[in-house]
Regions:
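Glycine-rich, proline-tolerant flexible connector loops at the mouths of alpha/beta enzymes
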Residues: 34-58, 69, 101-103, 175-179, ...
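N-terminal beta1-alpha1-beta2 module of alpha/beta enzyme domains
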Residues: 1-66, 149, 359
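Hydrophobic faces of well-ordered beta-strands that scaffold small-molecule active sites
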Residues: 9-15, 35-37, 62-66, 93-97, ...
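Active-site mouth loops of central-metabolism enzymes
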Residues: 8-18, 67-76, 145-156, 212-215, ...
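Short, acidic/polar
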Residues: 16-27, 78-81, 154-163, 310-320
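Alpha-helix-loop-beta-strand connector modules within alpha/beta enzyme cores
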Residues: 46-68, 72, 120-127, 191-195, ...
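An alpha-helical appendage that flanks or caps ligand/catalytic pockets
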Residues: 2, 110-142, 187-320
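Acidic (Asp/Glu)-rich catalytic clusters
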Residues: 25-29, 51-62, 82-93, 165-166, ...
Length: 359
């Protein structure tokens, strides 16, 4: 039987587009703990408007972005926005913020370095809490506040995870598709927490983005139109997250930066794939999908980036992540009807909890 001291398994939904008030209510009824909106100023709906409407439609789920970027608004503007969401939602808001890798690149700006990111993020949190802060050498203070807004960092790399452990109330991990990565995340967040006299399990929530899909075929997600393109992008992004290493350093850098172990044969094929990858054809093109096939990486990528197959197999796959210490999952909608996606996800987590309790 499951241990009485185990953390509960929770789930929430990630959507880049406004899905409607009935959808938000349906998420809450399904048992979801969180609704979060992606931010990309040139490609997604504005998250703050969607979140404000979801706040009106719901009473229990927590609400926030996954994740906003520093510099898009001034710290006082962002603090005012999420203080307002905190008021509208009755205290259910959180603020997820990252260094802005994609959001800032999309508008021709450079992502923030970690030190500048930390200064920005902590200034926003202090302002939300009603404190006077110094930002850019100038004092700032909001004239009103709805109370503290929990600060979550979007983090994947070791140093960012360590800073999250030191400072953040929560962490959103965008790439946590393997038990080794979960252990890697917990190690670095835990080290940061310990250095600050904090507790990994008591003071910090870690939420992992989980791409799970029930399909007729085992590991069937990679065969679905659109998801194959996503897997190709993620394969390239994995290499980029490792620091764009040369072939001879790829396996070592993935292990160091991500906690992911690959063998020499996969490293060789990954190096070939990334050398031929065309970022200009990353969307609405099968060019990079065909590259995955050419380098024999299609099945490898499908197993790595997706938890898919018949329900009992997906439960077993996600159960491996739970056994490694992951208990909070954010599920993005990748294809198909989003209301049906809510129902399938709720069914998956009901089965996952039952499996854990019976173990």
């Amino acid at each position: 039987m499951g241990s009485a001291g185990e953390s509960p398994i929770r789930f929430g939904f990630v959507t880049p587009y406004f899905q409607g008030l009935d959808w938000a209510r349906h998420c809450e009824v399904s048992g979801a703990d969180l609704i979060t909106c992606g931010e990309g100023p040139t490609v997604f709906d504005d998250p703050t408007l969607s979140l404000a409407l979801y706040a009106e439609a719901t009473t229990r789920v927590r609400l926030g972005p996954s994740v906003t970027a520093p510099g898009l608004p001034h710290p006082a503007v962002l603090a005012n926005t999420y203080s307002t969401l905190q008021k509208l939602s009755g205290g259910r808001a959180y603020l997820g913020i990252g260094t802005g890798d994609l959001s800032l690149i999309q508008i021709g700006e450079r992502p923030y370095r970690l030190d500048a990111f930390l200064e920005y993020a902590l200034a926003v949190r202090g302002l939300c809490a009603g404190e006077e802060v110094t930002y850019g050498g100038k004092p700032l203070k909001l004239e009103w506040t709805a109370g503290p807004v929990p600060l979550w960092f979007g983090a994947d790399a070791p140093r960012a995870l360590g800073l999250a452990g030191q400072h953040a109330d929560g962490v959103i991990v965008g790439q946590a598709f393997h038990p080794d990565i979960v252990e890697h995340v917990r190690q670095h967040v835990g080290a940061g927490a310990a250095a600050a006299g904090r507790s990994l399990d008591d003071d910090i929530e870690i939420w992992y983005v989980l791409r799970a899909l029930v399909t007729d075929e085992e590991h069937g997600a990679i065969r679905i139109d659109g998801l194959d393109e996503y897997a190709a992008r993620q394969t390239f992004f994995l290499w980029r997250m490792a620091g764009k290493p040369e072939r001879s350093e790829l396996a070592a850098e993935l292990a160091r930066r991500k906690g992911l172990t690959i063998d020499d044969d996969v490293a060789e094929r990954l190096s070939g794939f990334t050398a031929d990858y065309d970022e200009a054809l990353a969307f609405n093109s099968k060019h990079n999908v065909h590259l995955l096939e050419r380098y024999g990486l299609t099945d490898w990528a499908g197993r790595l980036f997706y938890k898919s197959g018949p329900l009992e197999q997906v439960v077993a796959q996600v159960g491996e992540l739970v056994a490694a210490g992951a208990t909070n999952f954010l599920v993005p909608f990748m294809v198909g009807d989003t209301t049906k996606g809510v129902d399938q996800t709720a069914e998956l987590f009901t089965a996952l909890r039952a499996s854990r309790a019976a173990a």
